[in-house]
């Protein structure tokens, strides 16, 4: 963190790490899910955490990814706006589904059911004026 006359700058990756740290436990993640979706689920074990951590392909990593109620939820925390977040989310979902689907099943005649993806980005300011 650096400080100037009237402002404090916080390292972007520190905020990102804090977001992941707070919601890495299923109980807290379920609470966030309920707040975002207006639901009242109580069993945190219904969550299946599937967050990508430094996947080999493109060195991708996302903040939070989990399956709940047949939805694949990808939650990202950003300190600045990025118009490329939808594309990044597409890459994340593709990489996650590659891991969940047996490659041989792609060539069979039966439909492979996948969870419906939901993307959510939490933004905050990168500069705090005091």
Which residues make up each language-model segment?
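Accessory alpha/beta interaction modules
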Residues: 1-128
């Amino acid at each position: 963190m650096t400080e100037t006359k009237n402002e404090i700058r916080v390292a972007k990756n520190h905020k990102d790490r804090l977001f992941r740290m707070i919601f890495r436990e299923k109980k807290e993640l379920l609470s966030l899910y309920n707040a975002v979706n207006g639901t009242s689920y109580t069993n945190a074990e219904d969550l299946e955490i599937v967050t990508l951590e430094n996947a080999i392909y493109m060195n991708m990593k996302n903040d939070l990814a989990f399956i709940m109620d047949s939805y694949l939820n990808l939650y990202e925390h950003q300190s600045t706006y990025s118009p490329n977040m939808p594309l990044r989310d597409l890459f994340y979902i593709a990489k996650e589904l590659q891991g969940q689907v047996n490659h041989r099943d792609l060539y069979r005649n039966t439909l492979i059911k996948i969870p419906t993806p939901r993307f959510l980005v939490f933004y905050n300011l990168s500069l705090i004026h005091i």
